[in-house]
Amino acid sequence: MLYRRNPQLNKNGELIHLLSIEGLPKAILTQILDTAANFVSVNNREVKKVPLLRGKSVFNLFFENSTRTRTTFEIAATRLSADVINLDIARSSASKGESLLDTIANLSAMAADLFVVRHGESGAPYLIAQHVAPHVHVINAGDGRHAHPTQGLLDMYTIRHYKKDFSNLTVAIVGDVLHSRVARSDIHALTTLGCPEVRVVGPKTLVPADMAQMGVRVCNTLEEGIKGADVIIMLRLQNERMSGALLPSSQEFFKSFGLTNEKLQLAKPDAIVMHPGPINRGVEIDSAVVDGTQSVILPQVTFGIAVRMAVMGIVAGNEA
């Protein structure tokens, strides 16, 4: 019954695909975070490898541009001793009109074991998961505006690392929430892990109308949104996904919602500042904050390797 309700889980409730944080039980999120904690030390070894995925083939399919996500997935799979194949979409048959499912079918014929997929269309990883063989696993590396589950998980790992638990935290998510798959994944993860107050902060034009239904507090001024916050997650303006005049200008946005050291004083003294990247300095966040003592943006990237190792190791170890 669990498998029918959630295509990410097998009949025993074990994770076989990671498509979205939404709908996953707290126990699975905790399992991933705990497993990631064990992998963090691998990054500090002289030989940065474990044999967990030896003999497995991992295909990275990035239909959208990426630096951090693609690179950390490649590093994670390599450190698990997998064979990693990065498909060059621009030079593949997909650029000649081959359908997504035909691409997957052909790669599956090459004995793929795991697909890491980033796609501009929401739901694309779900479609792939429905059409792969039972022994093949799918990880969503970002689909449209829908979800970015491994970013959400590495954000949770970062928060837990610095704040220990979620039970008394106030977390503010600031910026272009409307177009952000990261915001949605973070919100689902935070609520599942028991964070008592999640605030969504941004101009009305960049906050979805139904956001309050997700159990968050909507704030339309930065000052209200970050006052007393323990964690501030800044989001970039996704101009490539915008249509119409949602903002007067990036300069006006920075004036109202850009995080500066002066505004950061409104948060708790030990607040941490996060950002999923890429960062637009001087648009959503000032360079002094990015490079300041409360920024944990680079540790997020480091933790992302361990989290993605954990996800790949867990899904590859479970059968449909």
From Swiss-Prot:
GO biological process: 'de novo' pyrimidine nucleobase biosynthetic process; 'de novo' UMP biosynthetic process; amino acid metabolic process
Binding residue positions for L-aspartate: K96, R181, R236
Broad EC category: transferase
SUPFAM superfamilies: Aspartate/ornithine carbamoyltransferase
UniProt-listed Enzyme Commission number(s): 2.1.3.2
GO annotations of cellular component type: cytosol
UniProt: carbamoyl phosphate binding residues: R68, T69, R118, H148, Q151, G277, P278
Keywords, sorted A to Z: Pyrimidine biosynthesis, Transferase
Recorded catalytic activity of this chain's protein: carbamoyl phosphate + L-aspartate = N-carbamoyl-L-aspartate + phosphate + H(+)
Source species, domain of life: Bacteria
Biological or metabolic pathway of the protein: Pyrimidine metabolism; UMP biosynthesis via de novo pathway; (S)-dihydroorotate from bicarbonate: step 2/3
SUBUNIT field: Heterododecamer (2C3:3R2) of six catalytic PyrB chains organized as two trimers (C3), and six regulatory PyrI chains organized as three dimers (R2).
Role summary: Catalyzes the condensation of carbamoyl phosphate and aspartate to form carbamoyl aspartate and inorganic phosphate, the committed step in the de novo pyrimidine nucleotide biosynthesis pathway.
PANTHER family linked: ASPARTATE CARBAMOYLTRANSFERASE, ORNITHINE CARBAMOYLTRANSFERASE, MITOCHONDRIAL
Record-given protein name: Aspartate carbamoyltransferase catalytic subunit
Organism of provenance: Polaromonas sp. (strain JS666 / ATCC BAA-500)
Phylogenetic lineage: Bacteria, Pseudomonadati, Pseudomonadota, Betaproteobacteria, Burkholderiales
